[in-house]
């Protein structure tokens, strides 16, 4: 049954959904990598598609920017459409000197300055971590395709334009691999509702070095990250 934000029916979505922030990236993924594709959502322009990858039913849908937006879609997909696995495929900024543009980062854990997980976890610190099998499968898929990946902590920020640039020095000190805006929220929603989640990001800009990719590149050329996510789904145990 349709929700306020997703005009689909039960069965329209696969049990695994890849979620980029940009709905146009979702469209690109569906048209480039999936077969037998059909559109299953268009509410508020947040495009969703279902198709098959090497015979495996998979869906892809945008989640927008920030924890509030992605949490709405993740919650509804899990509770109203039976989704069991969410893999965020997005972009991130880097702060470490040895992390470069287009490097692929797997978010094993997600630090955050957001308070949403404290709200759902009785004002205590919740360890927002990815599902172990999903991490393991992503690493295995990357090795099989000879794609270098970095695995570790990322940071989910509430503000894109940070008023405290010194925080980036703290992130560098603590070895944060990437800075984005959603993973901690998705991990919290997955834990609350009994699903599994993973975040895979491609470095789109380096905060310290001042280098960046274009919006068109972010939309259509981060293919290694997508290939890792799709191949990792094929390794899931039933």
From Swiss-Prot:
Catalytic activity: a purine D-ribonucleoside + phosphate = a purine nucleobase + alpha-D-ribose 1-phosphate; a purine 2'-deoxy-D-ribonucleoside + phosphate = a purine nucleobase + 2-deoxy-alpha-D-ribose 1-phosphate
Keyword set includes Glycosyltransferase: yes
Protein's UniProt keywords contain Cell membrane: no
UniProt superkingdom: Bacteria
GO biological process: purine nucleoside catabolic process
Gene Ontology CC annotations of this record: cytosol
A single GO molecular function term of this UniProt record: purine-nucleoside phosphorylase activity
UniProt: a purine D-ribonucleoside binding residues: 5, 180-182, 204-205
EC number: 2.4.2.1
Active-site residues from the entry: 205 (proton donor)
EC class (word): transferase
Function: Catalyzes the reversible phosphorolytic breakdown of the N-glycosidic bond in the beta-(deoxy)ribonucleoside molecules, with the formation of the corresponding free purine bases and pentose-1-phosphate.
Protein name: Purine nucleoside phosphorylase DeoD-type
Organism encoding this protein: Proteus mirabilis (strain HI4320)
Gene this protein is translated from: deoD
């Amino acid at each position: 049954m349709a929700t306020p934000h997703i005009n689909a029916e039960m069965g329209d979505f696969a049990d695994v959904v890849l979620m980029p922030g940009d709905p146009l990236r979702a469209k690109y993924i569906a048209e480039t990598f999936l077969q037998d594709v059909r559109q299953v959502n268009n509410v508020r322009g947040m495009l969703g598609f279902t198709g098959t990858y090497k015979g495996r039913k998979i869906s892809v849908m945008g989640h927008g920017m920030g924890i509030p937006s992605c949490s709405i879609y993740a919650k509804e997909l899990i509770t109203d459409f039976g989704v069991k696995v969410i893999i965020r495929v997005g972009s991130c900024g880097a702060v470490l000197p040895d992390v470069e543009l287009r490097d692929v980062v797997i978010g094993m854990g997600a630090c955050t300055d957001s308070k949403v997980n404290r709200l759902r976890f009785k004002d205590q610190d919740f360890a927002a971590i990815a599902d172990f099998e999903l991490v393991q499968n992503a690493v295995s898929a990357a090795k099989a395709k000879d794609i270098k990946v970095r695995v570790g902590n990322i940071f989910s920020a509430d503000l894109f334009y940070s008023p405290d640039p010194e925080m980036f020095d703290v992130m560098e000190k603590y070895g944060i691999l990437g800075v984005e805006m959603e993973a901690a929220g998705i991990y919290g929603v997955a834990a609350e509702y009994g699903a599994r989640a993973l975040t895979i990001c491609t470095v789109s800009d380096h905060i310290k070095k001042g280098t960046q990719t274009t919006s068109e590149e972010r939309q259509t050329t981060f293919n290694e990250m997508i290939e890792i996510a799709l191949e990792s789904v094929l390794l899931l145990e039933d």
